[in-house]
Amino acid sequence: MTYLVSLLLMALIVGLIAVASNPAPYFAALGLVVAAGVGCGVLVSHGGSFLSLVLFLIYLGGMLVVFAYSAALAAEPFPEAWGDRSVVGYVMIYLLGVGLMVGVFWEGWYEGSWVVIDGLKEFSVLRGDTSGVAEMYSYGGGMLVICAWVLLLTLFVVLELTRGLSRGTIRAV
């Protein structure tokens, strides 16, 4: 299990570097899907299966559709690919930054312990992620509404940023 979590965390770093280093929206979308899937896998490995499923469905159902629509409207004739010099340079810079941070924090890495949600299940009556969902819907209803409005505002901001010179993205087809 430790090897699987380590592999998932390394794949998460690779996916995030793929998003940050590539200026072309097509390849960055692939990095986003990899990072979202692997991040949900990390959550599953720590016991949050329901939360990871909800996050993955929200991501694929909403944000990726908006991103694909906006990327199609802001199409480049010759996007930069994975093997271009500038992209490889950015990848090397980000890998160097990750390596430096690993070197700085390597000493205290194994001193602390992460306990998964049901790591001490003999002392608990409830499952961690399902009781968290109940708390979110009972006490976090206002925050859920605020988050929905922020996502709607983000949609309009992205559509406004990707509009052309004379015609916007919200137009009659």
From Swiss-Prot:
Reaction it catalyzes: a ubiquinone + NADH + 5 H(+)(in) = a ubiquinol + NAD(+) + 4 H(+)(out)
Report the main location listed first in the record.
mitochondrion
Cite the PANTHER family for this sequence.
NADH UBIQUINONE OXIDOREDUCTASE SUBUNIT ND6, NADH-UBIQUINONE OXIDOREDUCTASE CHAIN 6
Q: What function is annotated for this protein?
A: Core subunit of the mitochondrial membrane respiratory chain NADH dehydrogenase (Complex I) that is believed to belong to the minimal assembly required for catalysis. Complex I functions in the transfer of electrons from NADH to the respiratory chain. The immediate electron acceptor for the enzyme is believed to be ubiquinone.
* UniProt-recorded name of the protein: NADH-ubiquinone oxidoreductase chain 6
Q: Which UniProt keywords apply?
A: Electron transport, Membrane, Mitochondrion, NAD, Respiratory chain, Translocase, Transmembrane, Transmembrane helix, Transport, Ubiquinone
Q: Which Pfam families match?
A: Oxidored_q3
Asked if the Swiss-Prot or TrEMBL record annotates the protein with the keyword Electron transport, the reply is yes
Q: Name one GO molecular function term.
A: NADH dehydrogenase (ubiquinone) activity
What family does the entry list?
A: Belongs to the complex I subunit 6 family.
Query: What Enzyme Commission number(s) appear in the record?
Result: 7.1.1.2
Q: Is Transcription there in the keyword field?
A: no
Enzyme type, top EC level: translocase
Where found, per UniProt?
Mitochondrion membrane
- Segments spanning the bilayer are 1-21, 24-44, 53-73, 86-106, 139-159
Where is it found, in Gene Ontology cellular component terms?
mitochondrial membrane
Gene that codes for this?
MT-ND6
> What membrane topology is annotated for this entry?
Multi-pass membrane protein
